[in-house]
């Protein structure tokens, strides 16, 4: 296993483990998701540079666009949750009360 592949997979797994174990606050879950998306962006950008293909060079930009949309939707949910419930604790949220 190459060191670059190991670093990308370990960074992605670190974000995934943080998302699985730190599910008490919405902000920490959003930060773990952003770390995972950043790892995927760097991996796809490196992959498209190694291939020297023009057809795969647009994939990192598409991934970055989806990451920005995910971040804006997550921050909107965070603001709405903190205004309505007073905190970002995920244990206080109930979908039946919305």
Swiss-Prot record:
It holds the Pfam family Oxidored_q2. It is a multi-pass membrane protein. It catalyses: a ubiquinone + NADH + 5 H(+)(in) = a ubiquinol + NAD(+) + 4 H(+)(out). The chain crosses the membrane at residues 1-21, 26-46, 58-78. Disulfide bonds: none annotated. It is an enzyme of class 7 (translocase). One of its GO terms (biological process) is ATP synthesis coupled electron transport. InterPro entries: NADH_UbQ_OxRdtase_chain4L/K, NUOK/Mnh_C1-like. GO terms for molecular function: NADH dehydrogenase (ubiquinone) activity. Keywords: Electron transport, Membrane, Mitochondrion, NAD, Respiratory chain, Translocase, Transmembrane, Transmembrane helix, Transport, Ubiquinone. One of its GO terms (cellular component) is respiratory chain complex I. Core subunit of the mitochondrial membrane respiratory chain NADH dehydrogenase (Complex I) which catalyzes electron transfer from NADH through the respiratory chain, using ubiquinone as an electron acceptor. Part of the enzyme membrane arm which is embedded in the lipid bilayer and involved in proton translocation. Belongs to the complex I subunit 4L family. This is NADH-ubiquinone oxidoreductase chain 4L. It comes from Scyliorhinus canicula.
């Amino acid at each position: 296993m190459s060191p670059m592949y190991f670093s990308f997979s370990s960074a992605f797994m670190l974000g995934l483990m943080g998302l699985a174990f730190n599910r008490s606050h919405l902000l920490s879950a959003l930060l773990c998701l952003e770390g995972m998306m950043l790892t995927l962006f760097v991996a796809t950008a490196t992959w498209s540079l190694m291939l020297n293909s023009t057809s795969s060079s647009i994939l990192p930009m598409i991934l970055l666009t989806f990451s920005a949309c995910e971040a804006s939707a997550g921050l909107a949910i965070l603001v709405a949750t903190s205004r309505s419930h007073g905190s970002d604790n995920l244990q206080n949220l109930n979908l039946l009360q919305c």
